[in-house]
Amino acid sequence: MSDTEKSAQAQPNESAEPSFRYNAKLAQGIEEKWQKIWDDEGTFWAANVNGDLKDGKGHNAEGRPSYFAMDMFPYPSGKGLHVGHPLGYLATDVVSRYHRMKGENVLHAMGYDAFGLPAEQYAVQTGQHPRITTEQNIANMRRQLHRMGLSFDNRRSFATIDPGYVRWTQWIFSRIYDAWYDEDATNPSGSRGCARPISTLVEQFESGKRAIPGFEGKAWADLSEAEQADVLNDFRLAYISKSPVNWCPGLGTVLANEEVTAEGKSERGNFPVFQRELRQWSMRITAYGHRLIEDLDTIDWPEKVKLMQRNWIGESHGASVHFDVETPNGVKDMEIYTTRPDTLFGTTFAVVSPEHHLLEDVPAEWPAETPEDWKGGYATPVEAVKAYRLAAEAKTAKDRVDEAGEKTGLFTGLYAINPITGAKLPLFTADYVLMDYGTGAIMAVPGGDQRDYDFAVKFGLPVIYTVKPLPESGDDLANYEGKAPFVSHDGIVINSSIDATKAKGDSLSLDGLRVDEAIDKVNAWLESAGVGKGTVSYRLRDWLFSRQRYWGEPFPIVYGEDGTPHLLPDEQLPINLPDVPDYSPKTFDPEDAESDPEAPLSRNEDWVKVELDLGDGKKTYYRDTNTMPNWAGSCWYYMRYLDPTDTKHMVEKDEFDYWMGPDHNKTAGKSGGVDLYIGGVEHAVLHLLYSRFWHKVLFDLGYVDSMEPFHKLFNQGMIQAYAYTDDRGQYVPAAEVVEGPADANGEPTFTWNGQHANREFGKMGKSLKNIITPDDMYENYGADTFRLYEMGMGPLAESRPWNTRNVVGSMRFLQRLWRNVIDETTGEVRVTDGELDTKTLKLLNNTIADVTVEMEAMRPNTAIAKLIVLNNHLTSLDAVPRAAVEPLILMLSPIAPHICEELWSKLGHTESLAHADWPKADERYVGQDSVTAVVQIKGKVRAKLEVSPDIDPKELEKMALEAVADRLGGKEPRKVIVKAPKIVSIVPAE
């Protein structure tokens, strides 16, 4: 029997029930009632400092500490939510409700990330325009989330496709485009390096303070408009480049490195990705590499996410070295980056990427005595390079760098000159060198690198060892010579001495030094010789920012007849997408590496070609036909929650300082930012890194006052579920699977349509045919039961199994709470106003103290367990005292708000408990002795419970069974042995 069928059987029997029993029908009525009250009264409105959103439920921001909690907003690309999606939303809501009850001004809202590939692909599948399907999906998601009872300030909701939002996304792009990174300037946080308006760079060129690259000796005014644009393009933080990109024919667009899997496939769709040289927009995120690493120390994020970002950015210290390359067109410069400049004496050849510019200067004929196996069977270097470039384009990036793959390469006919030794190094091209990593050129040291060694062996190139093992290591270089490279950063430098260097004519010796000492010495020599310097490099590549899609933000850029880009003035924003029927991208055979992108907007000539006056009279311009990636809107959306009605500012300064500024509350710290951001760890090197980059640019330019967007990050786990396959391996509907008797090994059996079915455990998803929706839960149990079950399943940060059979346990808790307050027969309140006995006082105050700790630590599951203990105790009393049940209701309300609002109202309170004071423990009764009860199944400890020393054995048994319900699979145990208060031993049913 499937979980869905069992859930139906597990429903409380509503026939012949008392008239006022808490059941699914009553819950639905209560929930809809309170959701309407909350909406009508603006219960969850947060109060701004100024503007239209200043009033918040009769409160204002003055004197109230702010707290900003938010979720990673959803992509409205499917047909709605399943029960796994809201885990983070519910957690954020619980925290938000708790902080409101602490007297804080809480901002909690929800928007929709509506642009990008997911929404467009869904629209293509359904045959409708992306805007229509996206807005329908938003409406459905909004309904599902509203029905969940989430405490959003709905005045602050928006979608990234809203024209008013697109305007500010394009405005931010304009500021980034109109900025450059000055490494010598001091940023507002006091560290080195700062984004500055591009006008300040122009001033330096005009005044002569800075030489004009490529035009040394010329005045800025002597350059043409196109020449000036080209120079500035090399400095802008958003710039146009013709460079190797990840081209995905199956999707018809280019992808950022972060959107390509380790297998060289597109993250979405799993299509092959190829390296192509195309003209694209990029963002100079690498300029912020060091700050993006350094500032991780200022924020409260999971260490695993910090590590993922550090590794992705990949800061390394080494040297840039310039080699002269002799070409038919004169001596050219080849810059390489190496982390081991101490091995320059061991360089025996050099390698450039197939996309490297030096390959435009190869000779017409092979040099004399070129070995045949270096030529690859080609008559000339020109033919060889052309063919090799085509072959490289047809490979994925993963294929090119695969350590286990065959090392391919060709001699270019060129030689590079070692700046120290003067040795002529044959220059090869090989596809394992990528143009977008480092400089696209490497010096090869086969004595110290495995890949270089393999390449040298294949092409008969010399191997020079420049490092030997330390004497105390017990190792010897003889173990490697002629067999393998000696790859170590810890050793003694050898074979690295010369009487007269090529670049300076002086002597240089590194022999006898440790590697680190040799690196320092050679770096100093490189700088003194003018052929290099110590530098920092990053694994991180600049962010590829353009897509050949329809459903994205248009760029606020037009091009003149000469191709010069022009930024549109802010008053012309937003630039909206034209409403056209032909919005789908042109896709290709996934293996067609030779295909060329075709942006859908290029087909709309009336939109592309425009007459504009940009200050020098009306002229014809052409719009950029690329669109921004789906990450653009999500880079800054957190700030728009502060006031989406503001038409004058991206974010107004006073509002930013109040909600997100440095030290805006006791926990914000100097980094400032959102107080709590909940979302999946899968966004660690995508959205989270991009948002930090945009935020830092805006910080440098003075538009925001905090150096980080998100102060505290919390990654929720995943809700998992069973899925079922037939004997062909095809997934079958989980709701139609029937559980049969156990097999000979005691394992359950399953059938679908009378045929054997196999059960597996993993994700919940449409393709797995095991989706359970929140709507199912609302109908069968109510939103509060759903919230209570999901929050009580286990620690928020861990993945956990969904089991519909166990949802009824959460409903029974709410039913017991209801019965403690309401007479099920008459509907009358049944609490008393008597004083609490000592036992109840102790339990109540310890529960308040403990639950407060659990809520602060975001452990709602353990808070629920403690509230169950208190409620069970109240159930055992002859009469339930108001003084005990009201604090219980208040503490449960962040998790199950509707039933708590109803009970609070029935107890005579006229105001919503959403803003009631959180209970405070009376310290006189806190800290009383408790014991740890161990729950064992077949002798193995499966749970631990903190209980009162005088707990009733029956109550302990009930708590123990609830704690291990998932492990029992919904079956009654064969035997339970209770030794209160310390041990519960369970023998499960066979």
UniProtKB/Swiss-Prot annotation:
GO terms for biological process: leucyl-tRNA aminoacylation. Keywords: Aminoacyl-tRNA synthetase, ATP-binding, Cytoplasm, Ligase, Nucleotide-binding, Protein biosynthesis. Pfam families: Anticodon_1, tRNA-synt_1_2, tRNA-synt_1g. The keyword Nucleotide-binding applies. Residues 573-602 are annotated as: Disordered. A motif ('KMSKS' region) lies at residues 763-767. It is found in: Cytoplasm. A motif ('HIGH' region) lies at residues 74-85. This is Leucine--tRNA ligase. The gene is leuS.
